[in-house]
Amino acid sequence: MAKSALFTVRNNESCPKCGAELVIRSGKHGPFLGCSQYPACDYVRPLKSSADGHIVKVLEGQVCPACGANLVLRQGRFGMFIGCINYPECEHTELIDKPDETAITCPQCRTGHLVQRRSRYGKTFHSCDRYPECQFAINFKPIAGECPECHYPLLIEKKTAQGVKHFCASKQCGKPVSAE
């Protein structure tokens, strides 16, 4: 079957500009809805709705601390999260899985603790829970300990060809530390 035949499927929606039928078409950035009277009418819109976080399930008995309405499980562009049913009037959200908090204190501010976070690209890193006041972050697993060379109060764990090794977390030092 030809690609053009796949993407001229009728949708039974009418064009808001001219009243003709909308059809699913294929474009450079993926499928979209376009007017069947193209090029006379140039109406197009994305096939997927741009609403961030459609409702998956209503969580009965769970109330929003901000407005008192029910909380719902939503699917967003970064995965599942819990949010208020009154979105966008109430923007309260919660993470389903809380970040792993370590007992290791932040070596930069010495008051916060290091927590595991995930970047927008899916990479795991550890940073201070006092962000944005403290902007300490490392890409490797933090280990409690002190560097014998520079006395930096944090070590990191790296997986090398020789196995798992510990290194100083200081960017100025970075020397390997023997496992004691």
UniProtKB/Swiss-Prot annotation:
Top-rank taxon, per record: Bacteria
Family under the similarity heading: To H.influenzae HI_0656.1.
Gene Ontology BP terms: DNA topological change
Gene: yrdD
Name of the protein in question: Uncharacterized protein YrdD
SUPFAM superfamilies with a match to the protein in the record: Zinc beta-ribbon (SSF57783)
Molecular functions per Gene Ontology: DNA topoisomerase type I (single strand cut, ATP-independent) activity; iron ion binding; single-stranded DNA binding; zinc ion binding
A GO-annotated cellular component: chromosome
